Amino acid sequence: MNALAKIKAFRSYVPLLQGNTKTIYLNQSFQAPMNMLVSTALQGYINEGLYNPHPKPMWKERTEETRSLLAKLLNASTKDSITFTRDTTEGLNLFQRSLKWKPGDNVVILDNEHPNQGFGWIALQNDGLEVRLVPNEGQYHANASTFAPYVDSRTKAIGLSSVMFHSGQKNDVKDIANAFRPKGIHVLADLTQQVGLSKIDVQDLNVSACAFSCHKGLGCPTGLGVLYVSPLAISELRSTPPFVGGGAVEDFKEDLKLKLNAKYHQSALRYEHTNNAYMLITALRAYLKFLLKVGISNVERYLQGLGKDLIKELESLNVSVIGYKDFDKHSSHSYVLKILNPEWFDFLRQQGVCVSRFESGIRVSFGLYNTSKDIIKFISVIRKGLALNIPLNIRPPQRIAVMDNPLVGISDEAIAAMKLPANTLSNRPLAANI
């Protein structure tokens, strides 16, 4: 079976979409619907616990296999550069709180960055770290020149998402890292909206670290994340991890005896727990094996094809998509329609369409389970709404985020359409002097 056939077969693994002509699921960027590859793996894990008196060694071995699969997907130079976390927030915070800095030093982020990145830095303000915000409203691509006016000799890090959750904007992480890493400035990337949906090469990106959750492009339940830390960056971080258990200690012995001169792993393994979320790692392993067989480049091309079809159909209805159409500057799977009238979200929900709503418009996002038929159905619903004379662009009176959708639920993005609190942060441009 070739890659395209495997992708098309994947829809049959998603029970939500089987025999269901009502639901049009276009909300991958919120969370992927459960698939049978993962649910079968989860049931297998439960059975191992039910009928095996000592399953833990097997689960630990599986964890290392999954770490290796992730290293292959990300093109990490070593699997030890990868550690498992609870989610993106934990992964980002582990790196943020490992950074060496002094009061008066600063970090630079976009003013509409995801809260998981933004508030992690903001929490360090009380200790003397300055957080500088780069205005990004109306901009749909960030590169090194975007950040340059805000960087100076006391800048310690730049934090950003590779793909912005509220616009589909794809930022040039590589350009940013190549410009600022040689100056001793770390680059911390949130890859949650990209991993599993388009190709990522962490060595080529040249980032210090990146983090992501596994419940979007990697098809897993919530509760599992990944942190990658470049082997080149480890020595530049604090010598002691933010929190420490036995898993962080390199020479931890089976006799479990404590010693005062503990030596921590000189890799991302220093952030590891003694016990991991083995059940979720089992689920991740199942999806990664499928994904690697299909090929991430094939996944990216398939999703881009759906995106091109969507844009073409929308243009025929005079409905625009915000941002660039060039995939160098836009994600492979996520598109925000410039539909500002909140009536549309309610109408789409009534028609069985699962999407997300932001201040900037309605977000449509694709997964491997989507086909061109979903686009045809969605466009039919849009035509129906237009025929009912529902205005497209009545701007809502206040900022909005992902709305309460009984078909979807509420995400941690619910506050993310609000800009980060500029009244407590520095957002003035500065002349770069390094």
Swiss-Prot record:
It comes from the Eukaryota. InterPro entries: Aminotrans_V_dom, PyrdxlP-dep_Trfase, PyrdxlP-dep_Trfase_major, PyrdxlP-dep_Trfase_small. Keywords: Pyridoxal phosphate. Pfam families: Aminotran_5. The modification N6-(pyridoxal phosphate)lysine is found at K216. Gene3D superfamilies: Aspartate Aminotransferase, domain 1 (3.90.1150.10), Type I PLP-dependent aspartate aminotransferase-like (Major domain) (3.40.640.10). GO terms for molecular function: cysteine desulfurase activity. This is Uncharacterized protein C11D3.10. It comes from Schizosaccharomyces pombe (strain 972 / ATCC 24843). The lineage of its organism: Eukaryota, Fungi, Dikarya, Ascomycota, Taphrinomycotina.
